[in-house]
């Protein structure tokens, strides 16, 4: 839970993130946070719970999209909070046989995290040809940003490349 805590307190408006990090520098023990033993620990735990609540709602919604398909695609719109990597990683651990695609629409673009237990970077590279977008990363964990008007074409090409086994 501490790992999730540290990821999540870095999310949100920058003034809230700065306040959380400043408060974190005054923490002497993780139990101050986990057991809310001090005012600083209570503040940080409350902020974490607020962010985690948003995340858990998205995670629950993403799990509703699980089908027999090899690909688990989840799309959400969130202007302030980006959970694409966190969702992709957790869903990959829960559904290791799936190709996970988490996409967040923001500013006319689809910001994506892609995960699989096998190499998908080549499929991503090929799917981006002729598309207004960019992407890359590790062999089985990639990120991409695709213009919304090209999203459907990109998605079709990426799924075809996955089937082909690139």
Tell where the protein language model's regions lie, with residue ranges.
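A structured phosphate/pyrophosphate-recognition subdomain
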Residues: 1-67, 77-78
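Glycine-rich, acidic loop segments that terminate in or are immediately followed by a histidine
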Residues: 70-166
């Amino acid at each position: 839970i501490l790992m999730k805590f540290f990821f999540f307190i870095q999310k949100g408006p920058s003034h809230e993130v700065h306040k959380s990090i400043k408060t974190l520098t005054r923490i002497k023990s993780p139990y101050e946070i986990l057991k809310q033993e001090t005012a600083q620990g209570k503040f940080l735990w409350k902020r974490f719970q607020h962010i985690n609540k948003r995340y858990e709602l998205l995670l629950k919604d993403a799990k509703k999209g699980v089908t027999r398909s090899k690909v688990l695609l989840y799309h959400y719109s969130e202007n302030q909070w980006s959970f694409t990597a966190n969702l992709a990683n957790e869903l990959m651990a829960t559904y290791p046989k799936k190709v996970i695609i988490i996409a967040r629409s923001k500013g006319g673009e689809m910001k994506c995290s892609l995960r699989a237990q096998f190499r998908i970077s080549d499929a991503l590279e090929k799917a981006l040809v002729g598309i207004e977008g960019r992407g890359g990363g590790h062999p089985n964990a990639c990120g991409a940003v695709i213009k919304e008007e090209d999203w459907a074409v990109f998605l079709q090409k990426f799924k075809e490349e996955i089937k082909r086994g690139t």
